[in-house]
């Protein structure tokens, strides 16, 4: 079991997206995603999210809003992944060159034109509607979504 965080940083009707292009053997290669990563030993989800936002963007997240809990069973024929999904609207600092890929502010109206995971398209819509949810996304060996389920808490 892997625990992780995923953050979407928002400003002026735009979302900071990461185009994964720089890591070798990256399951997310070529996809547009939020920023985040694995929770380290002794770290809370919030501490992880703040650390990952800083490491990948150079920005200091000043306020996190929990929007969702994500479950990816047997992802990439590996372990189950569980994620905490946050929105960040209060932050400071300047964007750096990310070690993960290319960062770009994308108009919210253009987000779904990007190449992203099928499940991400679903949960980003819920996130943008300010809905709190718990969702499970099942992918096949070809990285296609086979099924999903969601519970809303609003």
Question: Model-derived features: where do they sit?
Answer:
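Conserved N-terminal beta-strand and adjoining loop/helix that marks the start
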Residues: 1-17, 35-38
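The catalytic Nudix box helix
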Residues: 34-68, 86
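Conserved hydrophobic/aromatic beta-strand scaffold that supports enzyme active sites
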Residues: 8, 17, 83-87, 105
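A conserved beta-turn-beta hairpin within the catalytic core of GNAT-like acetyltransferases
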Residues: 26-30, 79-82
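NUDIX/MutT-family hydrolases
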Residues: 87, 96-127, 147-154
């Amino acid at each position: 079991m892997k625990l992780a965080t995923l953050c979407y940083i928002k400003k002026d009707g735009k979302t900071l997206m990461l185009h994964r292009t720089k890591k070798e053997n990256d399951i997310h290669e070529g996809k547009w995603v939020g920023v985040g990563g694995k929770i380290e030993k002794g770290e809370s989800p919030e501490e992880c999210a703040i650390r990952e936002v800083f490491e990948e963007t150079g920005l200091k997240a000043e306020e996190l809003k929990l929007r969702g809990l994500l479950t990816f069973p047997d992802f990439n024929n590996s372990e189950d992944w569980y994620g905490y999904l946050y929105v960040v609207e209060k932050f400071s600092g300047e964007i750096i060159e990310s070690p993960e890929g290319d960062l770009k502010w994308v108009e919210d109206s253009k987000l779904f034109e990007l190449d992203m995971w099928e499940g991400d398209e679903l949960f980003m819509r819920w996130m943008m509607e300010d809905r709190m949810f718990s969702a499970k996304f099942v992918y096949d060996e070809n990285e296609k979504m086979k099924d999903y389920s969601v519970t809303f808490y609003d």
